[in-house]
Amino acid sequence: MTTIPAIGILPIDFLTILLLFSFISHSVCVEFAEDAGELDKSNAFRRQVPQWAVGHFMGKRSLSDDTEQATMYSSRFVESTS
C-alpha cells in the first residue's frame, strides 16, 4: 500500500495556502472584535453620569465643608512675636 501525498491529489499552490490562512486569521479577528463591541455596549448602559464631570469634581469639597473645618481647627501657623 503506497501513500499518496495530498499535494498530488489536490494541487494547492503557495498563494492558495496563503489566502486560506489569511481567511482563517481574519475570521478569528472579526470574532474578537464583535466581543469587544458587545462589552462596550453593556458598559455604556451602566454609566449614567457624564464622564466629563467625573474628573472635574474629583477631590473637590463644598464651601460649607471648608468653613466648618476652619472653625473647628485653630490655625497651624505660629505667630511670631517681635
Swiss-Prot record:
- GO biological process per UniProt: defense response; neuropeptide signaling pathway
Protein's cellular compartments: Secreted
Spell out where the chain crosses the membrane: none
Please give the residues making up the propeptide in this record.
28-47, 62-82
According to the UniProt entry, which residues carry Methionine amide?
58
**One GO cellular component term:** extracellular region
Tissue-wise, where is it found? Expressed by the skin glands.
Supply the alphabetized keyword list: Amidation, Amphibian defense peptide, Cleavage on pair of basic residues, Secreted, Signal
Annotated signal sequence is 1-27
Q: Which domain of life is it from?
A: Eukaryota
Q: A Pfam family this protein belongs to?
A: Bombesin
Q: Note the InterPro entries from the entry.
A: Bombesin
Show the PROSITE patterns listed in the entry. BOMBESIN (PS00257)
Family, according to the entry, reads as follows: Belongs to the bombesin/neuromedin-B/ranatensin family.
Identification of the protein by name:
Ranatensin
